[in-house]
């Protein structure tokens, strides 16, 4: 068998999903309540990076891009993450605030998909979170001009040591190019794997002040 033939065997990689179902009678009226329950269970199951989410944005040519970012806060106003404001995703969101998030909790056979709009956080919100980060992470935020091309990793490491020396006294200041976004939820879909590929999917869609809930075919 050639290497190419071996690679083609991925078509046969599959497993049954047997960890349980999701039924309408178990659904709360608010999607954030179910999200919180599932996130807590993901943390209790000791999944690697349970707050990791795929963030999808589009550029001015409608070309989609994805990357993994950590969720840092959520409440009834939305889901929050932080980033370099010079990054590609930040530029995308300045031009088009439409955004999609995905939480892939594979070990629990679950996914949560979110669509909505992103808006910049206030400087006060960003400052409060920034100073809660480990000091080296604060310095690291100063080092990288995110998404720019660099010649070698050594450039970053040298800059980090330089700034660590510079900021050795007192607080590390908040970079003007570092901030965050809040995603206001318009839709939230919960996916639970099921046997024979008969997965359970429920879509919460905002309907004025309430939420409309629909079961979707897998």
Swiss-Prot record:
It comes from the Bacteria. Homodimer. Its cofactor is FMN. The keyword Oxidoreductase applies. The keyword Cell inner membrane does not apply. Pathway: Cofactor metabolism; pyridoxal 5'-phosphate salvage; pyridoxal 5'-phosphate from pyridoxamine 5'-phosphate: step 1/1; Cofactor metabolism; pyridoxal 5'-phosphate salvage; pyridoxal 5'-phosphate from pyridoxine 5'-phosphate: step 1/1. This is Pyridoxine/pyridoxamine 5'-phosphate oxidase. InterPro entries: Pyridox_Oxase, Pyridox_Oxase_CS, Pyridox_Oxase_N, Pyridoxamine_oxidase_dimer_C, Split_barrel_FMN-bd. NCBIfam families: pdxH, PRK05679.1. One of its GO terms (biological process) is pyridoxine biosynthetic process. It comes from Enterobacter sp. (strain 638). Binds 1 FMN per subunit. Catalyzes the oxidation of either pyridoxine 5'-phosphate (PNP) or pyridoxamine 5'-phosphate (PMP) into pyridoxal 5'-phosphate (PLP). Substrate binds at residues 14-17, 72, 129, 133, 137, 197-199. HAMAP family: PdxH. Keywords: Flavoprotein, FMN, Oxidoreductase, Pyridoxine biosynthesis. FMN binds at residues 67-72, 82-83, 88-89, 111, 146-147, 191, 201. Belongs to the pyridoxamine 5'-phosphate oxidase family. It catalyses: pyridoxamine 5'-phosphate + O2 + H2O = pyridoxal 5'-phosphate + H2O2 + NH4(+); pyridoxine 5'-phosphate + O2 = pyridoxal 5'-phosphate + H2O2. Pfam families: PNP_phzG_C (PF10590), PNPOx_N (PF01243). Gene3D superfamilies: Electron Transport, Fmn-binding Protein, Chain A. GO terms for molecular function: FMN binding; pyridoxamine phosphate oxidase activity. Its EC number is 1.4.3.5.
């Amino acid at each position: 068998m050639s290497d190419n033939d071996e690679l083609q065997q991925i078509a046969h990689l599959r497993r049954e999903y047997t960890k349980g179902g999701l039924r309408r009678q178990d659904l709360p009226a608010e999607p954030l309540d179910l999200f919180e329950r599932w996130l807590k269970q993901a943390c209790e199951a000791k999944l690697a990076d349970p707050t990791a989410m795929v963030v999808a944005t589009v550029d001015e040519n409608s070309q989609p891009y994805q990357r993994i970012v950590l969720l840092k806060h959520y409440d009834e106003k939305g889901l929050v993450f932080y980033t370099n404001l010079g990054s590609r995703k930040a530029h995308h969101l300045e031009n088009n605030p439409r955004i999609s998030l995905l939480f892939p909790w594979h070990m629990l056979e679950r996914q949560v998909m979110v669509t909505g709009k992103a808006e910049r956080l206030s400087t006060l919100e960003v400052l409060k979170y920034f100073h809660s980060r480990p000091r080296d992470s604060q310095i690291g935020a100063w080092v990288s001009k995110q998404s720019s091309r660099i010649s070698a990793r050594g450039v970053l490491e040298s800059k980090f040591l330089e700034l660590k020396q510079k900021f050795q006294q007192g607080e590390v200041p908040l970079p003007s190019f570092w901030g965050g976004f809040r995603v206001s939820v318009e839709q939230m879909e919960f996916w639970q794997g099921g046997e024979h590929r008969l997965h359970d999917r429920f879509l919460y869609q905002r309907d004025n002040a309430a939420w409309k809930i629909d079961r979707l075919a897998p």
